[in-house]
């Protein structure tokens, strides 16, 4: 059990026999009336996000989620295979469980897998990854670091929007949460 004071992003709650992860929360203390906590909860099974408001101090049942450090090994055609770093057990994970971040996976990349009662719930990739540009159109004379963008295909096959000065062969830092370009890595 936890109170609303214990809320933090990533905490998994058990509400209405469903596991819901806190994506966002905000403590609100209005000038008149009692304080409350506004949250955005993501159903860990369906991925649906809902808004829910709790009165401050309310006790809520939390789910005991086991986070394990694992290493992504390979894609066997249908599933993504990861290995537990402690006992070297290999576990296949479905594409639905991997989510959109799967397009940035490289072999031997560290990931965190969250389990509830020995069932994998969700996978967390590193916040940013460094990937090489496999193909992008050449930049034009006069391209500057500010301005437009163009598509670039990365070594994993993912396509992202990058600034015009990026060339094939550059190594880029990419945010795995939204697929956005962060910076060019000096080689």
UniProtKB/Swiss-Prot annotation:
Please cite one Gene Ontology biological process associated with this protein: peptide biosynthetic process
Q: What's a Pfam family in this record?
A: Elong-fact-P_C
Q: Which domain of life is it from?
A: Bacteria
Q: Know the name of this protein?
A: Elongation factor P
Keyword Cytoplasm present in the record's keywords: the answer is yes
| One cellular-component annotation, GO | cytoplasm
GO MF, any single term: translation elongation factor activity
Q: Which CDD domains match?
A: S1_EF-P_repeat_1, S1_EF-P_repeat_2
Which SMART domains does the entry mention? EFP (SM01185), Elong-fact-P_C (SM00841)
User: Which cellular compartments is it found in?
Assistant: Cytoplasm
Which family does the entry's similarity section mention?
Belongs to the elongation factor P family.
Organism for this UniProt entry: Corynebacterium kroppenstedtii (strain DSM 44385 / JCM 11950 / CIP 105744 / CCUG 35717)
Q: What gene is it encoded by?
A: efp
The pathway this protein participates in, as annotated, is: Protein biosynthesis; polypeptide chain elongation
Report the protein's function: Involved in peptide bond synthesis. Stimulates efficient translation and peptide-bond synthesis on native or reconstituted 70S ribosomes in vitro. Probably functions indirectly by altering the affinity of the ribosome for aminoacyl-tRNA, thus increasing their reactivity as acceptors for peptidyl transferase.
Alphabetic keyword roster:
Cytoplasm, Elongation factor, Protein biosynthesis
């Amino acid at each position: 059990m936890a109170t609303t004071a214990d809320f933090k992003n990533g905490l998994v709650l058990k509400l209405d026999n469903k596991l819901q992860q806190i994506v966002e929360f905000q403590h609100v203390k209005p000038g008149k009336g009692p304080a409350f906590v506004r949250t955005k909860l993501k159903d860990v099974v369906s991925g649906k996000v809902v808004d829910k408001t709790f009165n401050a101090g309310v006790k809520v049942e939390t789910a005991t989620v086991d986070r394990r450090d694992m290493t992504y090994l390979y894609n066997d055609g249908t599933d993504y295979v990861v290995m537990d770093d402690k006992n070297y057990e290999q576990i296949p994970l479905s594409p639905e469980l991997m989510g959109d971040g799967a397009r940035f996976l490289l072999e031997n990349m560290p990931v965190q897998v969250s389990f509830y009662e020995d069932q994998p719930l969700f996978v967390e990739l590193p916040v940013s990854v460094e990937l090489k540009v496999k193909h992008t159109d050449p930049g034009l004379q006069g391209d500057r670091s500010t301005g437009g963008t163009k598509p670039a295909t990365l070594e994993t096959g993912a396509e992202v929007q990058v600034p015009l000065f990026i060339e094939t062969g550059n190594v880029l830092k990419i945010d795995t949460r939204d697929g956005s370009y962060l910076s060019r890595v000096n080689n």
